[in-house]
Each structure stands twice: as structure tokens, then as C-alpha cells.
Design a protein with these regions (language model features):
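N-terminal Rossmann-like dinucleotide-binding module
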Residues: 1-54
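Residue-level signal for inorganic ion chemistry
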Residues: 13, 49, 57, 92, ...
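A short helix->loop->beta-strand "cap" motif at the edges of active sites that frequently abuts
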Residues: 53-55, 71-73, 111-114, 136-139
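Short acidic-hydrophobic, aromatic-tinged amphipathic segments that line or gate anion-handling sites
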Residues: 58-60, 73-80
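Short, polar loop motifs at secondary-structure junctions
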Residues: 41, 60-66
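Beta-loop-alpha module in the N-terminal Rossmann-like domain of NAD(P)-dependent dehydrogenases
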Residues: 76-107
Length: 177
């Protein structure tokens, strides 16, 4: 019997993607990587696809498509990224940068997938819409980046009515190095 969780990883070649892949490597008995995307790093995407035998693969920027050598078929473009997020799975991890993750994240929720999201911009720009849709679809939105995950964990265990405002900072992504 297979009780593994099926995972789709959007933004596999970035810092959130790398962290997620380390976790998946350490827990191969618990997770299947069923979908993966990168923006333009086709070579690293190929390595990931070959290592995990990922069946659903997207490169959102077509410029480097000739550098892809993964063993499974590659789909290209932003519309393919949105279609990838709609594939039924247990969790879509979105490590996409800024508002580029807005449509794929909404597609994931609309398809009934739980969403582990690493960027703040998506929820800042469309938080009410996302929360309404997640409630309607009975799915969870889980923050995975350090700052908003810490805030989520604090608020989850305390009385939220005692909070007047929350200030978010940035330390990863382009600020990492």
C-alpha cells in the first residue's frame, strides 16, 4: 500500500526548491515528487527530473529549452505552469518569486490542492481572494518561508484578537547572499 504524499514543486531550482528537495531526499519513503518546474535553469531541472523520475515537468521561460535533457517530457510556458499546479496532489509547494506565483498558486487551490507557499507577495496582493477560495475548496494554505511561517506558528497558538498588526521582513530569495 502506498501512503506517500504526492508533491508538486514550483520553482525547484531556487532557494525554496533546493530546501524542499533536501527534505524530499531525506524522506523518500514519505513523498513522491509528481510535478516540478523551473523558470530558466533547464540543466538543473533536468538533473532533478532524472533523480526523482518526475512525470510532469515545466520550464516557464522557453529561452533555455534546448538545455533540457531530462528523461521525461518537458512542457514550456506560463500556461503550462498553471496547468501543472492544477494536477491533483496532496501539496503544491510554491517557491515562485513575487507575483509570478499568483496564478499558479490560485490554480492549485482551485483544483483542491493544499498550498505550501513561500512568497509573501501572493497573499499581500490577493490574500482575501485566496482565503475565500481555500475556505470554499476546504484546502490549507501553509506558509513555508521563515518569516511568515514563524508568524503563522505564533498566531496559530495564540489569540489572534490580541494582534494589532504584523510586520514582515525579507531575508531570503535575492537577499540571501
Amino acid at each position: 500500500m502506498n501512503n506517500k504524499k504526492n508533491i508538486i514543486l514550483l520553482g525547484a531550482t531556487g532557494s525554496i526548491g533546493e530546501s524542499s528537495l533536501r527534505l524530499l531526499r531525506k524522506n523518500k519513503e514519505k513523498f513522491n515528487l509528481v510535478g516540478v518546474s523551473a523558470h530558466n535553469n533547464a540543466e538543473l531541472l533536468s538533473k532533478i527530473v532524472n533523480e526523482f523520475d518526475v512525470p510532469n515537468v515545466v520550464l516557464s521561460d522557453p529561452k533555455n529549452v534546448k538545455s533540457y535533457y531530462g528523461k521525461n517530457e518537458l512542457y514550456v510556458g506560463q500556461s503550462s505552469l498553471i496547468e501543472l499546479a492544477k494536477i491533483k496532489c496532496d501539496v503544491v509547494i510554491s517557491g515562485l518569486i513575487g507575483t509570478s506565483g499568483l496564478y499558479p498558486a490560485y490554480a492549485a487551490i482551485s483544483a483542491g490542492n493544499n498550498l505550501a507557499i513561500a512568497n509573501k507577495e501572493t497573499l499581500v496582493s490577493a490574500g482575501k481572494i485566496f482565503m475565500k477560495k481555500s475556505f470554499e475548496k476546504k484546502v490549507k494554505i501553509l506558509p513555508v518561508d521563515s518569516e511568515h511561517s514563524a508568524i503563522f506558528q505564533c498566531l496559530e497558538k495564540n489569540n489572534i484578537s490580541n494582534v494589532d498588526f504584523v510586520t514582515l521582513t525579507a531575508s531570503g530569495g535575492p537577499f540571501l547572499n
